[in-house]
């Protein structure tokens, strides 16, 4: 110890003056950070007086004060106290290190949450100058609400609904120019348009679609009037069919199975089905699968609100809807429809081979009166007749469909606010612009909200807000033909978007009522939606947030709110095709369908009457929801996506598989590997959480690495074992095809209905063991691949699969 003390004294004698590290506050672009610099001697004294959070001093250097006459007593005392001095210095150093670490970590804890970067500062002052200092979550929220309140949502909805905007029309071309000019006026970083040349189907004015009675001798008789020749089903098969009429409820598979079980076979017949529950495309596909000749689709008055003060759909009005079971241009499946692109001579497998035509309630009433046969089940009954509905069969009908295909240019409009730290990661929000009729609820509301959000965020940027990630605002064309504009864009940039798009928010069908709120979304966004619902006031329950309104009727908020993404949503392709989490939220009318959707009666006036004057408040609530989602997704340091949520999704689906464990065991099959893959995913998600929690928050390289892993979770659930050209919707939970969990479950159910009932049966219509083994293997390896990818680098993967 004496020798150590001597060396320490000699080192001090060799140091001519003291040197210490000073941390000083930095102004300008790095304001709020600490900067390290070396200060020597007296030059550092003034700085230390200004800001020195911690100062460690050893013994004073020799020569720094007048020499003492006698150092021997001091040296002797020093030798006796040396162990204590060293121990004290070590304790001070350790304490200072821990204090400094905590202080450094704490300086970024304004967020109050390990996955939040926008601070939850509850002490916000309303008249804060946004140009001064750091913007906390409450600052951004107040800024957003301040600028959003200055908009003219209702007037934009009214004006947009008055304009003709069928895809490819002159009116749509004029609206496209106006909206692009509106984006340009907001001084965004980038504004541009892309054009696609797509195949759209329209009625032939010279040869309208027709419906006739046919007598027993096969002679065509009286024509049934189709009141509006403009109402049709895009992508219906062309031609004419004749068959007996059968009533098939909503045209779901279970409806058709029930029909067959009651002795009425759909094969070779025309089906009369009701609007609603599933899409037109699904109705026609199901009818085709059950051998029907054609489909007539009508709006059943019993399915809509019977509240006298509210308007109802005219009994002479038919409902428009495309019948392509897919999205995008069905004549270029899997390929973008840019000009001069060469396409293979193949059409989408989702195009039907049977014709379909919408009819009004009045025509349906005439048809239902002619039906004989068994009485329909009670839940199939409607309000068109004074007597019960029958299943049929009824008289023969002849349906003629003469729609024609036209190559049509469509235009998507883009506006971008570039991000500050991660400009190559995009938070995307879009709304359909086109409409077959007035389209007030269908697309005018979404277009108005999109334009208002562009204006609001542009104003926020002018007042100091700079998002971490880029915001991409898009106005889609061709939406009424099956999200054609959005899907073609995704197909054109597929190799880029799954790496760069963080989330997609859809504003389509946002206001269809004001009683119920539904969010059709990916599981990754469920927790974020819950958080944002707590920040937005209910438009029709004063003093309550939307979250409080929801849990008042059902404590299980997600069971009340969350729904799967439907194929007829523009958000569907983002998730099922590209692997980007997406959400589309809607206010509904007390679980009753909005009666005017996809009709010529979807006007501003009818929408206003249905909402009884609350349209501005509900549209404002949607804008607040969307805007606060955008702030969180574009500004948070760590993406607020709940990557662990898919573990619960897998568990729920495994519960459905367990029902068949006994049947599988009898055939020597097991679900063990599915359980193992889920376990690996859960462990990988928890490991990532722990890594994030224990990491240095100011390390931008680590932050970006974590964000990349988080934002690609949805992509991990796209099956890598099927071709995007053959099976574009590769998502194993939300997609369509033999690779999905739904297809595997449907196949398993054949075990119970397999006529042979013996292991190894290979009936083409029954359970096929070889096919099931392949389905199970591909599904399991997709799950395992997701777990491995979430684990990070290959040397971090720890499983015994």
UniProtKB/Swiss-Prot annotation:
Clinical note on disease: Hemochromatosis 3: A disorder of iron metabolism characterized by iron overload. Excess iron is deposited in a variety of organs leading to their failure, and resulting in serious illnesses including cirrhosis, hepatomas, diabetes, cardiomyopathy, arthritis, and hypogonadotropic hypogonadism. Severe effects of the disease usually do not appear until after decades of progressive iron loading.
Function: Mediates cellular uptake of transferrin-bound iron in a non-iron dependent manner. May be involved in iron metabolism, hepatocyte function and erythrocyte differentiation.
Membrane topology: Single-pass type II membrane protein
Motif annotated as Endocytosis signal, chain positions: 23-26
Skewed-composition ranges (Acidic residues): 35-45
Entry-listed glycosylation sites: 240, 339, 540, 754
GO molecular function: co-receptor binding; transferrin receptor activity
GO CC terms of this entry: cytoplasmic vesicle; external side of plasma membrane; HFE-transferrin receptor complex; plasma membrane
Species the sequence originates in: Homo sapiens
Chain segments carrying region Disordered: 16-45
InterPro entries: PA_dom_sf, PA_domain, Peptidase_M28, Peptidase_M28B, TFR-like_dimer_dom_sf, TfR1/2_PA
Regions of this protein lying in the Extracellular compartment: 105-801
Name by which UniProt lists this protein: Transferrin receptor protein 2
Tissue distribution of the protein: Predominantly expressed in liver. While the alpha form is also expressed in spleen, lung, muscle, prostate and peripheral blood mononuclear cells, the beta form is expressed in all tissues tested, albeit weakly.
Family, per entry: Belongs to the peptidase M28 family. M28B subfamily.
BP GO annotations: cellular response to iron ion; endocytic iron import into cell; intracellular iron ion homeostasis; iron ion transport; multicellular organismal-level iron ion homeostasis; positive regulation of endocytosis; positive regulation of peptide hormone secretion; positive regulation of protein maturation
Keyword Electron transport: no
Subunit structure: Homodimer.
Chief subcellular location: membrane
Pfam families per UniProt: PA (PF02225), Peptidase_M28 (PF04389)
């Amino acid at each position: 110890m004496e020798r150590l003390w001597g060396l320490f004294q000699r080192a001090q004698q060799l140091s001519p003056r003291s040197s210490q590290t000073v941390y000083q506050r930095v102004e300008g672009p790095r304001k709020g950070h600490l900067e390290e610099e070396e200060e020597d001697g007296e030059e550092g004294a003034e700085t230390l007086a200004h800001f020195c959070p911690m100062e460690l001093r050893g013994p004073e250097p020799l020569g720094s004060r007048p020499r003492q006459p006698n150092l021997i007593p001091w040296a002797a005392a020093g030798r006796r106290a040396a162990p204590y001095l060293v121990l004290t210095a070590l304790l001070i150093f350790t304490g200072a290190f821990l204090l400094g670490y905590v202080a450094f970590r704490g300086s970024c804890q304004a967020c109050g949450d390990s996955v939040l970067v926008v601070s939850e500062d509850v002490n916000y002052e309303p008249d804060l100058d946004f140009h001064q200092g750091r913007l906390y979550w409450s600052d951004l929220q107040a800024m957003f609400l301040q600028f959003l309140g200055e908009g003219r949502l209702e007037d934009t909805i009214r004006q947009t609904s008055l304009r003709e905007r069928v895809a490819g029309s002159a009116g749509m071309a004029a609206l496209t120019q106006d909206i692009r000019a509106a984006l340009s006026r907001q001084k965004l970083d980038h504004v541009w348009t892309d054009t696609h040349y797509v195949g759209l189907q329209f009625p032939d004015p010279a040869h309208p679609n027709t419906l006739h009675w046919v007598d027993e001798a096969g002679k065509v008789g009286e024509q049934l009037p189709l009141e509006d020749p403009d109402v049709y089903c895009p992508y219906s098969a062309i031609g004419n069919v004749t068959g007996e009429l059968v009533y098939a409820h909503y045209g779901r598979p279970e409806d058709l199975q029930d029909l067959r079980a009651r002795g009425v076979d759909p094969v070779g017949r025309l089906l009369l089905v009701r609007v609603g529950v599933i899409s037109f495309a699904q109705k026609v596909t199901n009818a085709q699968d059950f051998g029907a000749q054609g489909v007539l689709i009508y709006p059943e008055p019993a399915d809509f609100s019977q509240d006298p003060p509210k308007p109802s759909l005219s009994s002479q009005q038919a409902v428009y809807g495309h019948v392509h079971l897919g999205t995008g241009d069905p004549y270029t499946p899997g390929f973008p429809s840019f000009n001069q692109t060469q396409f293979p001579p193949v059409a989408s497998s989702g195009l039907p081979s049977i014709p379909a035509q919408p009819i009004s309630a009045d025509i349906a009433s005439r048809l239902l009166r002619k039906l004989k046969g068994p009485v329909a089940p009670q839940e199939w009954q409607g309000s068109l007749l004074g007597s019960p509905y029958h299943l049929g069969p009824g008289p023969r009908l002849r349906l003629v469909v003469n729609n024609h295909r036209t190559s049509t240019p469509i235009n998507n409009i883009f506006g971008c606010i570039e991000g500050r730290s991660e400009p190559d990661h995009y938070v995307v929000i879009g709304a359909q612009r086109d409409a077959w009729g007035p389209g007030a609820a269908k697309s005018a509301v979404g277009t108005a909200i999109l334009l208002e959000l562009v204006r609001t965020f542009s104003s926020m940027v002018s007042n100091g807000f700079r998002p971490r990630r880029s915001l991409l605002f898009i106005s889609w064309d061709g939406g009424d033909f099956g999200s054609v504009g959005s899907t073609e864009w995704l197909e054109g940039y597929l190799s880029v978007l799954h790496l760069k798009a963080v989330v997609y928010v859809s504003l389509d069908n946002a206001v269809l009522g004001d009683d119920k709120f539904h969010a059709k979304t990916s599981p990754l966004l469920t927790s974020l939606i819950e958080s944002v619902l707590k920040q937005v006031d209910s438009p029709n329950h004063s003093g309550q947030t939307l979250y409080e309104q929801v849990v008042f009727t059902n404590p299980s908020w997600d069971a009340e709110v969350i729904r799967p993404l439907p194929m007829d949503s523009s958000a569907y392709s983002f998730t099922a095709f590209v692997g980007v989490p997406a959400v589309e939220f809607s206010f509904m009318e007390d679980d009753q369908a909005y009666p005017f959707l996809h009709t010529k009666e979807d006007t501003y006036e009818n929408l206003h009457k249905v909402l009884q004057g609350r349209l501005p408040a509900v549209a404002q609530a949607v804008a607040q929801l969307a805007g606060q989602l955008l702030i969180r997704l574009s500004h948070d340091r760590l993406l607020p996506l709940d990557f662990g949520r898919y573990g619960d999704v897998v568990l729920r689906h495994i519960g459905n598989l367990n029902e068949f464990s006994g049947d599988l065991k009898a055939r020597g099959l097991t679900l063990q590997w599915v359980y193992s893959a889920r376990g690996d995913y859960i462990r990988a998600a928890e490991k990532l959480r722990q890594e994030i929690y224990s990491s240095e928050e100011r390390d931008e390289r680590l932050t970006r690495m974590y964000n990349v892993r988080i934002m690609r979770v949805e992509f991990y659930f796209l099956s890598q074992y099927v071709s995007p050209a053959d099976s574009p919707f590769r998502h194993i939970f939300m997609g369509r095809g033999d690779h999905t969990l739904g297809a595997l479950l449907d196949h398993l159910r054949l075990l119970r209905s397999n006529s042979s009932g013996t292991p190894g049966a290979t009936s083409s219509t029954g359970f096929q063991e070889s096919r099931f083994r392949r389905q199970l293997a591909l599904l399991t390896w997709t799950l395992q691949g997701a777990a491995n990818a979430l684990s990070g680098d290959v040397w971090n993967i720890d499983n015994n699969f």
